[in-house]
Swiss-Prot record:
GO terms for molecular function: calmodulin binding; DNA-binding transcription factor activity; transcription cis-regulatory region binding. The NAC domain includes a DNA binding domain and a dimerization domain. Changing A491R: No effect on binding to calmodulin. It comes from Arabidopsis thaliana. GO terms for biological process: cellular response to osmotic stress; negative regulation of DNA-templated transcription; positive regulation of defense response to bacterium; regulation of defense response; regulation of DNA-templated transcription. This is Protein NTM1-like 9. The chain crosses the membrane at residues 489-511. Residues 9-159 form the NAC domain. Transcriptional activator activated by proteolytic cleavage through regulated intramembrane proteolysis (RIP). Calmodulin-regulated transcriptional repressor. Binds several synthetic promoters with randomly selected binding sites. Functions synergistically with SNI1 as negative regulator of pathogen-induced PR1 expression and basal resistance to a virulent strain of P.syringae. Binds directly to the promoter of the PR1 gene. Acts as a positive regulator of innate immunity. Involved in the effector-triggered immunity (ETI) induction of immunity-related gene expression. Keywords: Activator, Calmodulin-binding, Cell membrane, DNA-binding, Endoplasmic reticulum, Membrane, Nucleus, Repressor, Stress response, Transcription, Transcription regulation, Transmembrane, Transmembrane helix. It is a single-pass membrane protein. It is found in: Cell membrane; Endoplasmic reticulum membrane; Nucleus.
Length: 512
């Protein structure tokens, strides 16, 4: 048949049969002699042509880098099954493992991948020409029945030499060759979907706040997501004197610790706003909270400058600082509060005087964290960041030390000390029953062995060890006895031998 031009077909038509269709339809008809039904695939001996000459012999003219051909089986040996795949310029080399082709869970064929090499083996140069060879495995398609001819179907590819978007050419070629369904083929023209120019309005609930908007709107209506860590620092810290919500306190009392003689900065003993009430109000209505409103939440009984120093721990900071301060301030608080005991007179405490050094270490760590946070945050977004001022605590001795958490160290006995005590408590006890049994055994055996049995007790486990000790004199005597017995035996044997020899000589003389 004549060549079929792709221009005569509507745009989007492709000749891409699946592996099952190539074997179960095209190869079956070709092997059974129905050549007119599969004339869309030409009959070419690919081993007599170079791979770059084969695209011109294809019936279907297409711009896609793949072509189909029927090829008669050319045996390399008359009685063998190996195919002759050598051409004038090179050879086809099989690579990889043969893949099975199934139709409804039934094996109908195999697919072999071959690569063309220039020159002769083993010094051939690999090229970008690849071929898939399809062969049937069914008994009725072996080509030996009457009217059948042995054929294989070859699918030729050519890989691009350049890289496409950083992807290797091998992967691009195999990816393109595996698109069989119409859904995998897309048009070359891709139209962009027009984006909406409508600006997204900020919810009214966030008006009046300073740092709770989750995105910023630009002039063209594009929404820019604000980083989560910037939400904590999106308001001015200079005018903020009231504490922002932080992690929930684990102390039973709120802010008033007047039962232990705690004094506020303004000299009054009135407690500030309750921490529980403050957190409940903030977390229940987070949208209504703002930096301006936080100042008005103070207790009227306390002056603006009369916020106690303990509340400064709840100042606005980055999430890392808030977590670090809360962790350092409230670690092991349950165990520590159970052990705290305050004096009845003047709020005296029995803690050591190195509390100020503990606070100075905390202040230094806090300054280091603030410095790192300032270096990591980007500038130029209208966010004013101010480092937190260190809390200067005056040394008031042991009388008024505030509510700072202390750390109690519990001393545990090490394993070495326990072992030493066990070794000291170890005793060697002689068991009378074992001693009598050993004495009876020595009397029966007649040996001069001195039995000595010791009991080594460790805790509740006792180990009885029997040890037999003998003096040096006893050992020497026993050795002498054994040596005398040996000589007696040797002498007796020699006498018997001599007597026997003499009797033999006498009998010989008598008989003669």
């Amino acid at each position: 048949m004549g060549a079929v031009s792709m221009e005569s077909l509507p745009l989007g038509f492709r000749f891409r049969p699946t592996d099952e269709e190539l074997v179960n339809h095209y190869l079956r008809l070709k092997i059974n002699g129905r050549h007119s039904d599969v004339r869309v695939i030409p009959d070419i001996d690919v081993c007599k042509w170079e791979p770059w000459d084969l695209p011109a012999l294809s019936v279907i003219k297409t711009d896609d880098p793949e072509w189909f051909f029927f090829c008669p089986r050319d045996r390399k040996y008359p009685n063998g099954h190996r195919s002759n795949r050598a051409t004038d310029s090179g050879y086809w080399k099989a690579t990889g493992k043969d893949r099975s082709i199934k139709s409804k869970k039934t094996l109908i064929g195999m697919k072999k991948t071959l690569v063309f090499y220039r020159g002769r083996a083993p010094k051939g140069e690999r090229t970008n020409w690849i071929m898939h060879e399809y062969r049937p495995t069914l008994k009725d398609l072996d080509g030996t029945s009457p009217g059948q001819s042995p054929y294989v179907l070859c699918r030729l590819f050519h890989k691009p030499d350049d890289r496409v978007n950083g992807v290797k050419s091998d992967e691009a070629a195999f990816t393109a060759s595996n698109k069989y369904s119409p859904d995998d083929t897309s048009s070359d023209l891709v139209q962009e979907t027009p984006s909406s120019d409508a600006a997204v309005e900020k919810p009214s609930d966030y008006s009046g706040g300073c740092g709770y908007a989750h995105s910023n709107s630009t002039a063209d209506g594009t929404m820019i997501e604000a980083p989560e860590e910037n939400l904590w620092l999106s308001c001015d810290l200079e005018d903020q004197k009231a504490p922002l919500p932080c992690m929930d306190s684990i102390y039973a009392g709120d802010f008033s610790y007047d039962e232990i003689g705690f004094q506020f900065q303004d000299g009054t003993s009135e407690p500030d706003v309750s921490l529980t009430e403050l957190l409940e109000e903030v977390f229940n209505n987070p949208d209504d909270f703002s930096c301006e409103e936080s100042i008005s939440r103070e207790n009227p009984a306390v002056s603006p400058n009369g916020i106690f120093s303990s509340a400064k721990m709840l100042q606005s900071a980055a999430p890392e600082d808030a977590f670090f301060n809360d962790f350092m301030a409230f670690t092991d608080t349950d165990a520590e509060m159970a052990q705290l005991q305050y004096g009845s007179e003047g709020g005296a405490s029995g803690w050591p005087s190195d509390t100020n050094s503990y606070y100075s270490d905390l202040v230094q760590q806090e300054q280091m964290i603030n410095h790192n946070t300032e270096n990591n945050l980007t500038e130029g977004r209208g966010i004013k960041i101010r480092a937190r001022q260190p809390q200067n605590r005056q040394s008031t001795g042991l009388i008024n030390q505030g509510i700072a958490p202390r750390r109690i160290r519990l001393q545990l006995q090490s394993n070495s000390e326990v072992k030493e005590r066990e070794e000291v408590n170890e005793g060697h006890t002689v068991i009378p029953e074992a001693k009598e049994a050993a004495a009876k055994y020595s009397e029966k055996s007649g040996s001069l062995v001195k039995p000595q049995i010791k009991l080594r007790a460790r805790g509740t486990i006792g180990q009885v060890k029997g040890e037999r000790f003998a003096d040096d004199e006893v050992q020497v005597q026993s050795r002498k006895r054994r040596g005398g017995k040996r000589w007696k035996v040797v002498a007796t044997v020699m006498v018997a031998v001599m007597v026997g020899v003499g009797m033999g000589i006498w009998r010989t003389l008598v008989s003669s």
